[in-house]
């Protein structure tokens, strides 16, 4: 089998055990993306062309298309793709499994610039149901590529800037304890990474995320100062750190002023973890201060597995806040309310509140998610993943597949966040 040929070849790099074999077909970019559970753009497709040395292989991102003019300018010949029979003869791999590994000297392997957006990509491994996840540096080494070329188009337009407005990271000294506790009440969700600063930044960059918001939660009043200090430490153009507050913190209004002075981008509250009601009377002085300081607040909205029998932050309670503090910039996480889309429609759609998309892929049908987005307005929707709990690829792909226009996707993926945070 051709996959065994690749496996034997990759032994020299110690990578033979990293080959993934799928039960489903991965013969096309879309099929490979579904089988691997990644965005189609991260599939590294191998295209075969006639060349001076008998064959030129271009390894490009899944959303890229050959630019005939650029190809001719680079190689001095037209981009004529090989027939399936000729591709098999030259590479030893059938169409659907063509890959850049273990090529003879008369086959030139070139890597296209479209791949460099991603920390890791997935080329085939010789069969129509296989792949391997490699960094671009590994792909260059393992394929013995002759270099990088810029001979593709379309990808710059189809893969927009993405700002993830809902992610979490933890100091290394706390992450193990925190994740152990949270995993026990995660509704069966498994973290996609261990959310340290380094791992989260690496994961985001691997998925071509342009920036992400880090949302901390003070479950006890005593945690506010240290959490906000840590947020200030990691805050950057790439990590858009928010702060947090607890209503029982001594002089919480002064701490909100300090959050603003630290340059943090907003406040995160999680009523279930903090065991507070979002529309408790003592919260309104905090909301008014946030509005005064122009600090957006992200509220976990709807059901949460940490409190499965009592939902503290319902869409109706969020509406009380909207009505009482109209100057507050409020973000209702999880499309306004996990498992409460009927109440979201009743109380929140069309109101002065943003929704983020985190966990929508898990708790909403594609049709219901599109209905909510269109009813509320795409100018008030922010992309969010809830990393480390939500896989980025699945959530990006869901938004691309539900029927939104390119302009709507751009608004959700980055333009709304840029406007909201004045980036």
For the regions a language model picked out, list residue spans one by one.
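Extended, low-hydrophobicity, polar/charged segments
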Residues: 1-157
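Mid-to-C-terminal alpha-helical segments outside catalytic/metal-binding sites
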Residues: 157-168, 174-211, 375-380, 393-423
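Active-site neighborhood of phospho(di)ester-bond hydrolases with catalytic His/Asp-centered motifs
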Residues: 162-165, 213-215, 242-243, 268, ...
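Conserved, mostly hydrophobic/aromatic
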Residues: 166, 204, 231, 259, ...
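Histidine-centered divalent metal-coordination motifs
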Residues: 166-172, 300, 334
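Active-site gating/metal-coordination segments in enzymes
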Residues: 210-211, 219-305, 309-312, 363
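Catalytic pocket-lining loop regions of alpha/beta-barrel enzymes
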Residues: 265-266, 279-382
